[in-house]
Amino acid sequence: MNLMQTAEKQANAAQETRFFAPPKAKPGYEFAKRAFDIVMSFLALVILSPVFLAVSIAIHLEDGGNVIYSSIRLTKNGKEFKMYKFRSMCMDAEQKLDSLMSLNEMNGPAFKIAEDPRITKVGKFIRKTSIDELPQLVNILKGDMSIVGPRPLLVKYLPLYNEAVT
């Protein structure tokens, strides 16, 4: 093996190491990050409580159903938790999914259509403005999520991600 091949091999190994083994956090980092999450999510919940109230009333008035939708997700440590969102679809959205599968515009496990008839009028607005995500502040306060970090995976899609990686 010549010098150039050796250098290239070492560079590739270094890249793989950085990808698979992130650097260890400095002492106190996890504590500081958690403290930041608690303070910021608590303040946001207090400040945004009028928005929570208004959206809750609007969703309830539209169709009388549950205001909060939850789905099972995984924490960074692989523990399951319920992730909360404001409900943006009709109450029987899951039952209607099978009849809409032929309209799916995505390849793979995700389902998406441009004009999903299951999305309510209030739902369109709260999705467009990302207000539907605000209840996740409760997940952050509970320690299931963090303000800074990747979006938690849906448990039902986890096997599909594992297949794609291997």
List PLM regions with ranges.
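Hydrophobic structural segments characteristic of membrane proteins
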Residues: 1-18, 66, 134-166
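Juxtamembrane loop-helix boundary motifs flanking transmembrane segments in multi-pass membrane proteins
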Residues: 16-31, 114, 118, 153
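A hydrophobic, helix-centered structural microdomain
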Residues: 23-93, 165
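Cytochrome P450 core scaffold surrounding the K-helix E-X-X-R motif
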Residues: 92-100, 150, 154
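Short, solvent-exposed cationic patches
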Residues: 98-115
